[in-house]
Structure formats: C-alpha cells, structure tokens
Amino acid sequence: MKKTKRIFTALSHLFSPKWWKKNWQRVVLLFFFAVFALLLIFRFVPIPFSAYMVQQKIANLLQGDFRYQIQYDWVSLENISPNIQLAVISSEDQRFPEHLGFDFEAIQRAIRYNEKSNKGIRGASTISQQTAKNLMLWHGQNWLRKGLEVPATMLLELTWSKKRILEVYLNIAEFGNGIFGVEAASRYYFKKSAKNLSQNEAALLVAVLPNPIIYKVNKPSLLVRKKTSLDFETNGKFRY
C-alpha cells in the first residue's frame, strides 16, 4: 500500500505544472533526440508498426472491442504499383517532389478558403506531414500535437529521401477500419498484391484517404465515386 502511494505521489509531481515549467526544455530536447534516433533507424529498416496503429488498437480496447485486428503487410516501394504512387501524389500533395515538408502555397489557399467557406475546413497537410504524424504522433486537433508535427516533419525531410517518405506513407496510411498500408488494402479489397493495382483501383484507394472510416472502398458513396473519377482524370495528366 505504501509503495502504491509513493508511485502515485511521484506521478503527481511528474505531471504537476511546476515540474513541467522547470523541465520543459529537457523534455523538448529528449523528444527531438528520440525522433531523430527513430528516423535514423527507420531510414533503412521496415516499419513494424506506427504510433497511429497503437492509438487505434488502444482506443478500440478501451471501447470494449477486443476483436479489433490490425491488417498490415510491409512492402518495398519497388513492389508498389506506380499507379498508386502517382495517384497519391497527384491527389494529396502535387508539390511533394519539390517542397521541404510544407506546402506554403497550399496553406495560403486553405486559409483563404476557410475564411470564406462555411462548408467545412480544408487542410493543407503534405505527405511528409502525414507520414510524421502517422508514424510518431497521434491524431487529434490539439495544439501540442500540431506543434510537435512541425519539427518532426523537418527532421523527417532532413533524414529521409522523398522515395523513403513515400514508401513509408503508403505502408502506414489507413485505408479502412484496421487496414493499414497499400499491400493489406490491395489484398483485402481487390485480392491482389499492391504491385498489380490498376489505375482505377489506385484512384479508388486514394479517394478514401481523407477519412477511411467514413468513406468505403468496397461501398463507395457518390462522393467517393466522383473523387475517384476526378483522381483518375488528374493522374493521366500528372507526371512524377
């Protein structure tokens, strides 16, 4: 009992505002060091899992869903169809080959759109930002997560090539409830490997990326079908 009390006392000190005010610089430096070390390791080896996969698993367990399973199969970029490589860049981040992690033109367009429109908020996250968020952080709209995303993205661009960023993004992106990565998605929805995806199949997978829980590959809504057609048309004009 005394040991438990000591543990709770220590934790209360750790999470107190006074402790954070005194040690926040150390925490930030430790975060940067941990992220940099992680990126150096994963520059060369397959990613076993992402922070977002862990978040989803824990969230489902807390909700009492013990049957929730993660489907995930790592494949190299050479074993991913150029159709979906092209589709995801064309749809999600056309300036991906050029920018250094942040598309400031897209950010300005999103700000102008959000100021004038009441139809919802338009984002401007790049493939690099989404990769950093999915791999190392958590999903949410709080300022802490958004603040950490900036240095994490900068470190990602500093340590990885564009091809590596795209490879990891396609392997850890969510394409359905518990379905992570283009290989698992290809086998689940189309019964084939990711290297054999057609242009239309690639466009359909990319169309659900904004919200793969609401938008369904196997039951595409009118919006998804329209986006698939638009992505398919755009892909034919876009070159990477």
From Swiss-Prot:
Location relative to the cell: Cell inner membrane
Membrane-spanning intervals of the chain: 27-47
GO terms under biological process: cell wall organization; peptidoglycan biosynthetic process; regulation of cell shape
EC number: 2.4.99.28
Pathway: Cell wall biogenesis; peptidoglycan biosynthesis
Topological category with respect to the lipid bilayer: Single-pass membrane protein
Broadest EC class assigned to this enzyme: transferase
Superkingdom: Bacteria
Catalytic activity: [GlcNAc-(1->4)-Mur2Ac(oyl-L-Ala-gamma-D-Glu-L-Lys-D-Ala-D-Ala)](n)-di-trans,octa-cis-undecaprenyl diphosphate + beta-D-GlcNAc-(1->4)-Mur2Ac(oyl-L-Ala-gamma-D-Glu-L-Lys-D-Ala-D-Ala)-di-trans,octa-cis-undecaprenyl diphosphate = [GlcNAc-(1->4)-Mur2Ac(oyl-L-Ala-gamma-D-Glu-L-Lys-D-Ala-D-Ala)](n+1)-di-trans,octa-cis-undecaprenyl diphosphate + di-trans,octa-cis-undecaprenyl diphosphate + H(+)
GO MF annotations, alphabetized: pentosyltransferase activity; peptidoglycan glycosyltransferase activity
Keyword terms: Cell inner membrane, Cell membrane, Cell shape, Cell wall biogenesis/degradation, Glycosyltransferase, Membrane, Peptidoglycan synthesis, Transferase, Transmembrane, Transmembrane helix
GO CC aspect terms: peptidoglycan-based cell wall; plasma membrane
Family classification: Belongs to the glycosyltransferase 51 family.
Protein's job: Peptidoglycan polymerase that catalyzes glycan chain elongation from lipid-linked precursors.
Classification via PANTHER family: BIOSYNTHETIC PEPTIDOGLYCAN TRANSGLYCOSYLASE, MONOFUNCTIONAL BIOSYNTHETIC PEPTIDOGLYCAN TRANSGLYCOSYLASE
Protein name (Swiss-Prot/TrEMBL): Biosynthetic peptidoglycan transglycosylase
Protein source organism: Haemophilus influenzae (strain PittEE)
Organism phylogeny: Bacteria, Pseudomonadati, Pseudomonadota, Gammaproteobacteria, Pasteurellales
